[in-house]
């Protein structure tokens, strides 16, 4: 941030030290959340009041954030993990929200986290019930959901504009012979959560029986990494895409290729020999597929074509006993 330009005030006459307040709130949220969820010893570094162009020229509160170094292996083990990215992004958002609300003397409310424990079940010949559980945010008590939005997709179409519901379940008519899919978002006065996984159901004509599809693939993660055993731990380390590429959230556009330089002592020499961490560049223009959380519809279409009706649920709904497997016939 920078406080001296334009005689120390913004265009509306407010003090440029508001940039310091914005910086402090964002940094405080990031450090607190990382220490709580990942690394209790995470270092909180200083704030700089310096004349960087990006901080000096804007006539609104501004801050520059440098969190991780791409040349630091320990940093990048966090930096390419989609779960860590979400935590930090949400912390930045919370800091901005707290700053804006403080300017207008308003209580802030953080948008909820996505719901989980989702399940679909047949409750009649052509009716289904979708249920789920709210996820409370242990880092932010204001993020509790108040309502939910259920989005519906018929066949291969797109999702509709959603139906607002007040409770943790939703009943609807299920047309025969077509796959219907559902996702849920949580809602409060702070906004709308990220969407849930997508569940699907289908009612077959002259159904031979009912099949339960358990959506077990809910993983997102960074790729496999290693540090050589001591005393070679200072010599070799890196990421092993061939062992485990990791799973992006939805998709990834930052991946350029697998790592090829694992020697920690090798310095940067030029862009074609960039030292420890050097990667191939054969994926620079590619979009890498991630977890879409939209798989029951794929299996359900085949099940429906075979003459069986189907419903689906999340794996945590089975683990918690919300869905009882004995309700379904084993063949």
Feature locations, PLM:
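Pro/Thr/Ser/Gly-rich low-complexity, intrinsically disordered linker/stalk tracts
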Residues: 98-143, 176, 190-209
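Aromatic-Pro/Gly-enriched surface loop or interdomain linker
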Residues: 197-329
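Short beta-strand segments within Ig-like beta-sandwich modules, predominantly Fibronectin type-III
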Residues: 160-167
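Active-site-adjacent mobile loop/cap segments within catalytic or ligand-binding domains
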Residues: 38-105
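Beta-strand signatures of extracellular beta-sandwich domains
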Residues: 147-151
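A short, glycine/acidic-enriched catalytic loop
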Residues: 1-15
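Beta-strand-rich modules
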Residues: 171-193
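Active-site-adjacent substrate-binding region
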Residues: 15-49
């Amino acid at each position: 941030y920078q406080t001296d330009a334009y005689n120390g005030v913004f265009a509306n006459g407010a003090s440029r030290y508001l940039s310091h307040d914005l910086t402090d709130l964002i940094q405080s949220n990031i450090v607190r959340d990382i220490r709580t969820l990942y690394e209790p010893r995470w270092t909180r570094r200083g704030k700089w009041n310096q004349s960087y162009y990006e901080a000096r020229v804007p006539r609104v509160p501004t801050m520059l954030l440098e969190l991780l170094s791409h040349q630091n292996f320990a940093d990048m083990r966090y930096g390419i993990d989609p779960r860590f990215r979400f935590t930090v992004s949400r912390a930045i958002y919370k800091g901005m929200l707290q700053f804006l609300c403080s300017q207008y003397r308003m209580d802030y409310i953080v948008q909820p986290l996505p719901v989980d424990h989702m399940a679909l079940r047949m409750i009649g010949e052509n009716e289904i019930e979708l249920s789920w559980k709210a996820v409370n945010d242990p880092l932010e008590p204001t993020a509790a959901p108040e309502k939910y939005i259920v989005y519906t997709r018929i066949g291969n179409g797109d999702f509709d504009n959603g139906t607002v519901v007040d409770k943790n379940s939703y009943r609807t008519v299920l047309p025969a012979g077509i796959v219907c899919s559902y996702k849920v978002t949580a809602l409060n006065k702070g906004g709308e959560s990220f969407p849930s996984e997508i569940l699907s159901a289908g009612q077959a004509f002259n159904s031979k029986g009912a099949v339960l599809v358990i959506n077990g693939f809910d993983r997102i993660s960074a790729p496999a990494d290693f540090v050589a055993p001591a005393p070679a731990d200072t010599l070799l380390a890196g990421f092993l895409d061939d062992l485990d590429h990791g799973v992006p959230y939805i998709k990834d556009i930052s991946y350029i290729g697998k790592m090829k330089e694992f020697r920690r002592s090798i310095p940067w020499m030029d862009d074609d020999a960039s030292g420890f961490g050097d990667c191939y560049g054969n994926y620079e223009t590619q979009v890498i597929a991630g977890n879409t959380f939209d798989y029951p519809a794929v299996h359900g279409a085949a099940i429906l074509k075979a003459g069986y009706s189907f419903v689906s649920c999340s794996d945590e709904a089975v683990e918690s006993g919300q869905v009882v497997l004995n309700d379904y016939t084993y063949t």
